[in-house]
C-alpha cells in the first residue's frame, strides 16, 4: 500500500526558490496550452482530443521544452484525466443519469498563476531530492536540492508533488511512498468500541472491560484561539474594507490546520498501538451521517460553534488498521448515548422520516455520568462506546455483563 507524507519546502536559497517558482509557472502555462487544445477541438468537432494527439501538438512547445519530459507528460495526463471526467459526465447526461446544468468544461488557470509539479521519476543523490530539469533549462538555471525526510530513507518513493500555496509564497511537498502491510495475527474475538466526542475526543472501551479516553480539550483550545485571533483580523479587515482573505488569516488557518492534523494523527496512532499491544483484532467506530458535530463552548467572538474534523480521524484509523491487519467497522450510533448497556436496552435506529420517542432504563444524571436502572454509575461516554460495540454485534460481551462494571477509564493527553 501507499502512504503520503506532507511537508513545507524549507531551506532553499533565493535562487532555488525563484527557480522552483518559475518551474511552477511554466507548468501552469503548459496546463493552459493543453486545456486550450482540447477545448478548441471540442468546440469545432464535438469530439475529445486524446492524450497522444495533444502530446504530438505540444511536444515542440516552448513550455514543454523547458520542463523535464516526465514532468511535462504528467501535466498532460492530469489535464487528460480532468477532461475524461467531463466527457464521462456528458455520457451520463445523454442517458438521463445526470443533471446537465452541473457540468462545466475545465477552465484555464490564472494567467499569473502557478500549478503543481508532479515528479514521477524520482532522482535522489546523497539523501537529497534533485528536481529534474530539461536539458534546455539546466543550461541556465542552478539545480534545486531538497533534503529527504529521514523517515523516507530506504523507502521506495512512487511520486512527489510540489504544490504552490498562497500564490507560491511557499511550497508544500507530498511524498507518496510504498510500505508493506504488516498483517498481524490479532485476536478477532477482542474488540474496541470508540465513541467520538468533544471534551473526550475518543472514548475507547474493550469487550474485556478496559477503557481509556483521549483528551479533546486541546482541540477546543486550538479552535478557540484561532477564532479569537481571526475575529480580530476580520475586524481590522472590515474597518479597512478589505474583502479577500488576508495573508495573516491564511497563515493563521494553516497553523491551526497543521496542529489539528498532527493531533488527530497522534490520536489515531495511540488507538491502533493499544490494539496491537493488547491483541485486539477489531475496532468499531460510532459515526453520524455527516460525521461532524457542533458544540457550544460558551464564549464570544463567533466561538459558539467548533467544527472538529472527525472524518479525518476516521480516515487515519482506516488507513492504520489496513496497514496492520486490524478489522475496522463503522457503526451507526443513534441512541447509543441514551440506552443503558448494562440493562440491555434495545438500541433502535433513528429514522428522519418517522422520528419516535423511546424510553430507556437508565439516564444521564450529571455531565459525564450515567446511571443504570439499579443505581449503578458509569462514565456516560463509556456507556456510549459499549453500546456502539453492542450494536455492531462483532464481539461477545458476556464477560462485561457478568462483571457488571468497567475499569476506571484512563485519560490520555496527546502531546
What residue ranges belong to the model's regions?
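Generic detection of short hydrophobic beta-strand segments and adjacent strand-loop junctions
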Residues: 3-11, 138-148, 212-214
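Stable alpha-helical structural segments in soluble proteins, enriched in small hydrophobic residues
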Residues: 30, 34, 74-86, 380-395
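Positively charged, helix-rich recognition surfaces that bind polyanionic ligands
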Residues: 3, 169-415
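Acidic carboxylate diad motif detector
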Residues: 51-168, 303, 307
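Short amphipathic alpha-helical coiled-coil/interface segments
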Residues: 24-27, 75-83, 249-257
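Surface-exposed helix-capping loop/turn segments at secondary-structure junctions
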Residues: 39-43, 88-95, 277-281, 324-328
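An alpha-helix initiation/capping motif
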Residues: 48, 69-73, 77, 265, ...
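Gly/serine-rich nucleotide phosphate-binding loop at the start of the catalytic core
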Residues: 1-74, 96
Amino acid at each position: 500500500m501507499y502512504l503520503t507524507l506532507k511537508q513545507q519546502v524549507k531551506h532553499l536559497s533565493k535562487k532555488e526558490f525563484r527557480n522552483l517558482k518559475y518551474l511552477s509557472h511554466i507548468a501552469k502555462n503548459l496546463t493552459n496550452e493543453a486545456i486550450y487544445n482540447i477545448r478548441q477541438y471540442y468546440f469545432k468537432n464535438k469530439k475529445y482530443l486524446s492524450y497522444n494527439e495533444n502530446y504530438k501538438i505540444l511536444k515542440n512547445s516552448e513550455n514543454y521544452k523547458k520542463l523535464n519530459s516526465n514532468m511535462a507528460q504528467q501535466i498532460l495526463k492530469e489535464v487528460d484525466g480532468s477532461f475524461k471526467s467531463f466527457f464521462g459526465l456528458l455520457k451520463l447526461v445523454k442517458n438521463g443519469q445526470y443533471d446537465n446544468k452541473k457540468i462545466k468544461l475545465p477552465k484555464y488557470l490564472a494567467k499569473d498563476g502557478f500549478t503543481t509539479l508532479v515528479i514521477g521519476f524520482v532522482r535522489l543523490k546523497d539523501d537529497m531530492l534533485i528536481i529534474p530539469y530539461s536539458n534546455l533549462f539546466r543550461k541556465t538555471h542552478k539545480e534545486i536540492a531538497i533534503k529527504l525526510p529521514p523517515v523516507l530513507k530506504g523507502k521506495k518513493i512512487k511520486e512527489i508533488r510540489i504544490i504552490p500555496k498562497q500564490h507560491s509564497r511557499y511550497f508544500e511537498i507530498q511524498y507518496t511512498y510504498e510500505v508493506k502491510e504488516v498483517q498481524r495475527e490479532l485476536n478477532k474475538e477482542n474488540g474496541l468500541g470508540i465513541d467520538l466526542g468533544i471534551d473526550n475526543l475518543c472514548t475507547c472501551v474493550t469487550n474485556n472491560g478496559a477503557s481509556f479516553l483521549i483528551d479533546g480539550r486541546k482541540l477546543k483550545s486550538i479552535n478557540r484561539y484561532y477564532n479569537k485571533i481571526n475575529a480580530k483580523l476580520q475586524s481590522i479587515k472590515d474597518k479597512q474594507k478589505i474583502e479577500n482573505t488576508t495573508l495573516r488569516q491564511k497563515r493563521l488557518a494553516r497553523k491551526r490546520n497543521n496542529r489539528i492534523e498532527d493531533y488527530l494523527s497522534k490520536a489515531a496512532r495511540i488507538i491502533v498501538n493499544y490494539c496491537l499491544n493488547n491483541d485486539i483484532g477489531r475496532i468499531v467506530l460510532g459515526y453520524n451521517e455527516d460525521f461532524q458535530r457542533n458544540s457550544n463552548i460558551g464564549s464570544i467572538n463567533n466561538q459558539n460553534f467548533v467544527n472538529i474534523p472527525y472524518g479525518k480521524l476516521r480516515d487515519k484509523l482506516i488507513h492504520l488498521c489496513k496497514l496492520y491487519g486490524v478489522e475496522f467497522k463503522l457503526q451507526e450510533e443513534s441512541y447509543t448515548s441514551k440506552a443503558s448497556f448494562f440493562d440491555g436496552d434495545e438500541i433502535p435506529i433513528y429514522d428522519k422520516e418517522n422520528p419516535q420517542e423511546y424510553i430507556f432504563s437508565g439516564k444521564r444524571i450529571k455531565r459525564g455520568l450515567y446511571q443504570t436502572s439499579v443505581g449503578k454509575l458509569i462514565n456516560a461516554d463509556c456507556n456510549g462506546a459499549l453500546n456502539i460495540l453492542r450494536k455492531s454485534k462483532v464481539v461477545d460481551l458476556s464477560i462485561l455483563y457478568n462483571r457488571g462494571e468497567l475499569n476506571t477509564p484512563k485519560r490520555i493527553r496527546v502531546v
